[in-house]
Amino acid sequence: THLSTIFTENRLKKYIELRSMDTCGWDCLCSGPAFYIGMLYGNLDEVYEIISKWDNNKIINAYLEAPQKGFNTQLMGKDLLHWASILLDISKKGLENRDILNKRGKNESLFLNHLQKVIDNKLTNADHMVGKFSISEDLSELYDK
């Protein structure tokens, strides 16, 4: 059907289908799937303990604000960088515990390296793209008002 061509952020079928990250280079292609796998095979109770306290309206507001504010977007009184760091740690533990190794003996947590760099540098892919513009350039026209 034509409805199957609609690709929202995620779709629930006989499996969960997630949209990949946008503006993603080769170094981060596997980061998104690895992040979710790490949480699913990690401590779901720990993740649930965190997100169960989040208000649905605040989640939607953060989702809508994130393209403009990036890591400075607030969710439940903390910025997204805070939440990203916590959830990435949980995901990393999940992948380490899963202990699936490559030929070099490294576990799947290596796929999270790109996300860890983003958090450590506090710069998103969008921040890097905006950084290519002149400091004096007014980028507000890029956003709907």
Q: Where are these predicted regions, by residue range?
A:
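C-terminal accessory/tail domains of diverse enzymes
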Residues: 1-145
